[in-house]
């Protein structure tokens, strides 16, 4: 099946689902998940999204004299403060290009497709923006996505709840929790409807899940690695990932090494 054929079939795929049969495992769900983001899309997003939260930004402020700036000679031999380290960035940019994990992705879904409850890989910061969706009319239903989000500080309670009450390990992305399960949860749950132009920021290690609605939703997503997320990855996320035999994709120790090299020069 080509992407064109898939896009033309989304209306038919959407019409399968009703409020009474959405849990039927026999219904066909075709979700284009984790596909490479087209270069033209990534370039346009780079022009729109603030640089400090965009993919592979190098953590350097545009102004001089920022936090961490040091005195250094300019082209005239005068000592001036250089550029400081920005409060946000993506330390994946410290790695040589051939070592970087490609995580600028796209998601194309229809009513009934979903992302099961999970946490972002290696405790990274997640970013998800809806760039296009169907609208009511011409045989289509308005597209949006429903997010169920939790907080980083309650991650242990969430993990225990999923394991003891729902019978699923949050480290294994296989279970989509029902609304009633979220209602009974002993922790805060944030339900958000994402529409075109909405940027969802996903905290590190915060379990979340997504349900797609309507005929079509198209989203772009990326992850960022920072000093704080690296600490969480080394001490918590990676040991848990090893317990379920999940490969490390982000080369966290290499990121630390190359970042120290970069900023010590």
Regions found by a protein language model. Give the residues of each.
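Active-site region of the double-stranded beta-helix
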Residues: 2-198, 206-265
């Amino acid at each position: 099946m080509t992407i064109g054929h898939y896009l033309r079939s989304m209306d038919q795929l959407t019409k399968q689902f009703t409020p009474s049969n959405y849990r039927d495992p026999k219904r066909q769900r075709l979700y284009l998940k984790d596909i490479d983001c087209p270069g033209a899309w990534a370039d346009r997003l780079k022009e729109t999204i603030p640089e400090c939260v965009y993919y592979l930004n190098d953590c350097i402020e545009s102004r001089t004299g920022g936090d961490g700036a040091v005195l250094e000679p300019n082209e005239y031999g005068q000592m001036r403060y250089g550029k400081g380290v920005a409060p946000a960035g993506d330390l994946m940019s410290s790695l040589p290009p051939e070592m970087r994990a490609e995580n600028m992705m796209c998601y194309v879904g229809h009513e009934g497709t979903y992302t099961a409850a999970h946490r972002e890989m290696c405790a990274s910061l997640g970013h998800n923006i809806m760039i296009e969706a169907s609208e009511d009319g011409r045989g289509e239903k308005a597209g949006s996505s429903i997010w169920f989000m939790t907080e980083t500080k309650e991650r242990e309670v969430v993990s225990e709840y999923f394991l003891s009450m729902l019978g699923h390990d949050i480290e294994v992305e296989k279970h989509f929790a029902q609304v009633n399960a979220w209602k009974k949860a002993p922790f805060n749950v944030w339900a958000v409807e994402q529409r075109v132009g909405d940027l969802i920021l996903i905290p590190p290690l915060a379990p979340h899940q997504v349900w797609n609605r309507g005929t079509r939703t198209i989203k772009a997503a990326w992850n960022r690695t920072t000093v704080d997320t690296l600490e969480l990855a080394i001490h918590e996320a990676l040991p848990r990932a090893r317990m379920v035999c999940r490969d490390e994709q982000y080369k966290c120790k290499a990121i630390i090494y190359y970042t120290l090299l970069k900023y010590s020069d």
